[in-house]
């Protein structure tokens, strides 16, 4: 009798699933048991599964084990943390994009590391932009400054990645694949050139896949994003995902920090305790979500 084993889903190939055995590290191409189709059961990259090996390097997935979380875009299960890779040019990542991403990671209760990449190409003006990002975010999230070309920050970033399942995201062209190759050269990911006209890279990743680091841990390399959807968040819920807002006392317990009097958040913005860009981006998102409700 062949005993069931446990593994983790790395990627999909048509109707087949690549599974890595959690004990041996062996990779098998597995089919799904018929009940998945009959019961419309879903399976995602990052899922921990029970499977039955057939002894020839293949197997059949029997069950999906309990998920601690499931990200929607991209669909990834059991993620421990998010790594947001940003650049201040070629392309420039706006604080609005950063804050939208952070709203999503806060909503999904993920630890987040902000990586400022391409440090080797920045002039004095660019370095001032880097300092501004540090001023805005360093008290809220860990920041690692990196260069895949010079190796700057690579060892520091490895410490955050070791032993965890991380999702890495960022605008196309910020250098995610180059960073991953610098962190773990054995990955040999394809790297794109950045278009000077659009200042965006060509997408080198077309679907989510789980990549294993030699030093332990996994990363989900996902397609670059240009638009982040926060449409399933209620306007009144948004404030909870700007975590520095939660420390402030307002006169009204249900204050949305927009037009209400005696608002602790607005006072903190005026006093310089909360970054103006964070508050402006919050207000913009709040009105976007309100407008969605009226359409």
Swiss-Prot record:
Amino acids binding GTP: 117-120, 170-178
Keywords associated with the record: Cytoplasm, GTP-binding, Hydrolase, Metal-binding, Nucleotide-binding, Ribosome biogenesis, RNA-binding, rRNA-binding, Zinc
Requisite cofactors: Zn(2+)
GO MF assignments: GTP binding; GTPase activity; metal ion binding; rRNA binding
Tagged with keyword Cell cycle: no
The keyword Membrane is annotated on this UniProt entry: no
TM stretches of this protein: none
GO biological process: ribosomal small subunit biogenesis
Main location: cytoplasm
Subcellular location field: Cytoplasm
Domain CP-type G as annotated: residue spans: 68-228
Enzyme nomenclature, EC number: 3.6.1.-
Free-text comment on the cofactor: Binds 1 zinc ion per subunit.
PROSITE patterns from the UniProt entry: ENGC_GTPASE, G_CP
Protein residues bound to Zn(2+): 250, 255, 257, 263
GO cellular component assignments: cytoplasm
Domain of life: Bacteria
Sequence similarity: Belongs to the TRAFAC class YlqF/YawG GTPase family. RsgA subfamily.
Biological function: One of several proteins that assist in the late maturation steps of the functional core of the 30S ribosomal subunit. Helps release RbfA from mature subunits. May play a role in the assembly of ribosomal proteins into the subunit. Circularly permuted GTPase that catalyzes slow GTP hydrolysis, GTPase activity is stimulated by the 30S ribosomal subunit.
PANTHER family from the UniProt entry: SMALL RIBOSOMAL SUBUNIT BIOGENESIS GTPASE RSGA, SMALL RIBOSOMAL SUBUNIT BIOGENESIS GTPASE RSGA 1, MITOCHONDRIAL-RELATED
Self-association state and partner proteins as the record states: Monomer. Associates with 30S ribosomal subunit, binds 16S rRNA.
Protein name: Small ribosomal subunit biogenesis GTPase RsgA
Gene name of the encoded protein: rsgA
């Amino acid at each position: 009798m062949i005993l069931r084993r446990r593994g983790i889903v790395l990627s999909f190939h048509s109707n087949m699933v690549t599974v890595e055995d959690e004990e041996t590290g062996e990779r098998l191409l597995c089919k799904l048991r018929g009940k998945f189709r009959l019961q419309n059961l879903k399976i995602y990259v990052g899922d921990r599964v029970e499977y039955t090996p057939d002894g020839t390097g293949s197997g059949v997935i029997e069950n999906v084990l309990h998920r601690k979380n499931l990200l929607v875009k991209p669909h990834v299960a059991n993620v421990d943390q998010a790594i947001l890779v940003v650049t201040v040019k070629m392309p420039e990542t706006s604080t609005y994009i950063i804050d939208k991403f952070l709203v999503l990671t806060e909503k999904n209760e993920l630890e987040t590391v902000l990586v400022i990449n391409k440090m080797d190409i920045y002039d004095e003006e660019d370095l001032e932009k880097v300092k501004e990002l540090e001023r805005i975010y360093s008290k809220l999230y860990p920041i690692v400054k990196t260069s895949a070309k010079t190796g700057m920050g690579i060892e520091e970033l490895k410490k955050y990645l070791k032993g965890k399942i991380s999702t890495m995201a960022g605008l196309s062209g910020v250098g995610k694949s180059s960073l991953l190759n610098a962190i773990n050269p054995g990955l040999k990911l394809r790297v794109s050139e950045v278009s000077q006209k659009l200042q965006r890279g060509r997408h080198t990743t077309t679907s989510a896949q789980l990549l294993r680091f030699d030093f332990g841990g996994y990363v989900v390399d996902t397609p670059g994003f240009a638009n982040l959807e926060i449409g399933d968040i209620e306007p009144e819920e948004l404030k909870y995902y700007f975590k520095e807002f939660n420390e402030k006392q307002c006169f009204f317990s249900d204050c949305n920090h927009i037009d209400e009097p005696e608002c602790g958040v607005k006072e903190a913005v005026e006093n310089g305790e909360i970054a103006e860009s964070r508050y402006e981006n919050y207000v913009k998102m709040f009105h976007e979500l309100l407008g969605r409700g009226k359409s």
